[in-house]
Design a protein with these regions (language model features):
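Nucleotide-activated chemistry modules centered on ATP-dependent adenylation/adenylyltransferase
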Residues: 1-196, 201-206
């Protein structure tokens, strides 16, 4: 089921782990599974499906008290406003910043040491290269240096065309067209068609 593909999350599993894994619903769509659930009385028809592992605000799980910090414009270093903790924000976020500017602003970096949220224009969110570390070479035998692959930098991505290269500690990607808000700490997953070739943790993007 392409709409429910979980390969982005499973890409960190090794071949040894996958060899002991069974996906009994792998050949079925979510709609087909839901129909069986309804027939068995496990779900009622029309019931909303769950999208998250936690129904509340994820910041509740951090058990951290709010702490005032600055919202900084990247280009000038000017303070545009204040926030209650950098952990309330995500890279690429546009809504809910609570500041006014001549054009839309996006979160482009989070400085945990200074408790600062760095913002910039849409152009500042675009990157053409990234470095990923801690690689998991799922399809290493089929990897070709410099070949054009599809890469996902978030689970909801359709995949972006890029060239992939090995590095001493991982791999680098050069995107054919700029991508938006490649976030350090998130996974970068490289595909050849629908097959995962490798996965790594984004170290930086520019």
């Amino acid at each position: 089921d392409g709409k429910k593909d979980q390969s982005y999350f499973l890409s960190r599993l090794t071949q040894n782990q996958l060899s002991s894994t069974i996906f009994p619903l792998g050949a079925m769509t979510k709609d087909e599974v839901r129909k069986i659930d309804v027939e068995l009385g496990l779900h009622r028809e029309g019931m909303d499906e769950s999208q998250d592992f936690y129904g509340g605000d994820y910041t509740d799980l951090l058990n951290v008290q709010d702490r005032k910090g600055k919202i900084i414009l990247a280009d000038s270093g000017k303070c545009l406003g204040f926030h209650n903790g950098f952990w309330h924000y995500t890279i690429g976020q546009r809504k809910g910043l609570g500041i006014a500017y001549s054009e839309p602003l996006y979160v482009i970096a989070l400085d945990s040491r200074r408790n600062e949220v760095i913002v910039g224009t849409e152009k500042a969110t675009r990157e053409t290269t990234l470095l990923a570390l801690n690689p998991n070479w799922v399809g290493e035998e089929d990897f070709e240096e410099g070949k054009i692959y599809k890469a996902k930098i978030r689970s909801t991505s359709r995949g972006e065309d890029c060239r992939a290269f090995r590095t001493p500690d991982g791999f680098s990607l050069e995107f054919i067209s700029p991508v938006k808000a490649a976030t350090p700490g998130q996974s970068a997953v490289v595909y050849d068609g629908d097959r995962v070739i490798c996965s790594g943790v984004i170290e930086r993007a520019e």
